């Protein structure tokens, strides 16, 4: 079996996890012969090879191929795959996209934070992004709150932005951001490791966050509570060697307790875009 991007998608649809497919691809780099399906089952370490192979053979290739081709994609085997992303733990094997893939070539910074942000939190993000003077592509997750504020600030200041979503590219979540997602997909870039039609399941979003952080040289966080998803994303980013920039907030409402914790752990306190740019070498 030749491992093409379509075959990667088919392996996912047959039940292999991202990590299991990574094992197969890493093994395939070191051997010359094509792998049989039984080899893939063994190498991947899947729990029930018989069930996996049965699912694989039951797939209607004509239907799945049509689904796969609904949006362009690239895999970790392709030259356009970002090096920084390939270096993270559990790097996504396959990404669908809509928009301008050239944005992946430019320096990027991620922005994460609360979905239920305050007006002050949104304005703080807008101020920092405005101060970046379009030197960095803004990467975020198109969620409510801080994510939306980050994408909008980039657009309003004439910059570029990338949205990494936790659904298929033809699914809009939240629905209130449909127009924004369409706009970014037409003029900027939307990425997803989920195939067409895939819905917003809870576990998709922590997985999405690893891509947001992995694409970037640094992560800006605003209004992250303790034990929030944003805090976990930043802690993982620090483990991966990324810079973390925390915007401080009030000590009275608890909305920024996670940011303050990160500052204590070594994140850089930032109040302007210049604070962020000072850490980047161009």
Swiss-Prot record:
One of its GO terms (cellular component) is cytoplasm. Keywords: Competence, Cytoplasm, DNA-binding. Its main location: cytoplasm. InterPro entries: DprA, SAM_DprA. The keyword Ligase does not apply. Disruption phenotype: Loss of transformation. Imported DNA is very rapidly degraded. GO terms for molecular function: DNA binding. One of its GO terms (biological process) is establishment of competence for transformation. The keyword Cytoplasm applies. Induction: Expressed under conditions that induce DNA competence. It is found in: Cytoplasm. Protein that helps load RecA onto ssDNA during transformation. Required for DNA transformation. Not required for DNA uptake but for a later stage of transformation. Thought to interact at the cell pole with newly imported transforming ssDNA which it binds cooperatively, protecting linear and circular ssDNA from nuclease action. Forms bridges between DNA segments. Favors the loading of RecA onto ssDNA and formation of RecA-DNA filaments, triggering RecA-catalysis of ATP-driven homologous DNA pairing. Belongs to the DprA/Smf family. Homodimer; forms tail-to-tail dimers, forms nucleoprotein complex (NPC) which requires at least 30 nucleotides (nt) of ssDNA becoming optimal with 50 nt. Interacts with RecA, forms mixed DprA-RecA-ssDNA filaments. Interacts with ComFA and ComFC. The regions responsible for dimerization and for DprA-RecA interaction partially overlap, it is suggested that when RecA interacts with the DprA-ssDNA NPC it rearranges or disrupts the DprA dimer, leading to nucleation of RecA on ssDNA. This is DNA processing protein DprA. The gene is dprA.
